[in-house]
């Protein structure tokens, strides 16, 4: 399935920028060398996401189910959805595992990064077409998908009941356009390998520290002997999914 989304600030809208007018109190006889002008522009950007959809046993379109959004890493980008089944929940589903969630696993286009606003558009599309319990929407991702999880949790914390970024990079915690403190009240479970040479452990540590500085209580699991692949153990652990289901938005 393919989602096409036009957005500038996350939803389908056109941003109109109008230059403000500046007026100065000058003597009536004085001539001004400033003239009043205006500018307007329509800015749009298109995203097209293919995605895998898993419906749990018992789904009939009437009873509402929780939703798990899974974001893959950089190596699975492209236009072949088979790549998305290499890791994480899609891999487990392919092997026959049954989940109590609707699982949505989009594929990021080649040479692109996850965009939080486009992903929320995807979520809205899925919610509109399926019976989803909006109080139990969860997000997790690995590596580049861990970055996407941090992005979604920071820009749209109200949309998620819990988040689990795995070996992901977050933006600098104190930058003005990225505010992890918005998600400090959310349940967050972070995973990382101590010997990760691709995304250093410090990347997750500073995000965890940023949440704690603002009063958050994130869980942080460090695998002492793991390298970049800290996701296999994480996604194979039933406790992760039990933890997700134990949370819902108020």
Task: Locate the predicted segments by residue.
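A domain-start/cap signature at the N-terminus of enzymes
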Residues: 25-67, 142-147, 152, 205-209, ...
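Gly/Ser-rich "nucleophile elbow"/oxyanion-hole loop immediately N-terminal to the catalytic nucleophile
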Residues: 58-63, 111-144, 157
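Active-site machinery of serine-nucleophile hydrolases
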Residues: 67, 71-120
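Alpha-helical scaffolding within the catalytic cores
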Residues: 81-94, 122, 169-181, 202
């Amino acid at each position: 399935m393919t989602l096409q989304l036009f957005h500038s600030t996350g939803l389908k809208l056109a941003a109109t920028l109008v230059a403000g007018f500046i007026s100065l109190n000058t003597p009536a006889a004085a001539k001004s060398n400033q003239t009043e002008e205006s500018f307007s522009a329509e800015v749009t950007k298109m995203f097209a996401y293919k995605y895998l959809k898993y419906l749990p046993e018992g789904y009939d379109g009437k009873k509402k189910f929780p939703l798990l959004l899974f974001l893959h890493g950089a190596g699975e980008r492209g236009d072949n959805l088979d790549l998305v089944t290499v890791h994480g929940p899609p891999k487990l589903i392919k092997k026959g595992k049954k989940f109590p969630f609707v699982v949505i696993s989009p594929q990021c286009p080649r040479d692109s990064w996850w965009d939080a606003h486009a992903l929320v558009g995807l979520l809205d599309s899925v919610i509109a077409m399926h019976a989803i319990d909006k109080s139990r929407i969860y997000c997790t991702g690995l590596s580049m998908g861990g970055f996407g999880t941090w992005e979604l949790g920071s820009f749209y914390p109200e949309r998620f009941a819990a988040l689990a970024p795995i070996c992901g990079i977050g933006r600098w915690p104190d930058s003005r356009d990225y505010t992890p403190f918005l998600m400090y009240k959310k349940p967050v479970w972070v995973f990382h390998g101590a010997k990760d040479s691709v995304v250093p452990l410090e990347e997750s540590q500073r995000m965890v520290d940023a949440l704690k500085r603002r009063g958050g209580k994130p869980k942080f699991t460090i695998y002492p002997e793991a390298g970049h692949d800290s996701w296999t153990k994480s996604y194979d652990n039933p406790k992760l999914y039990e933890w997700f289901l134990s949370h819902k938005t108020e």
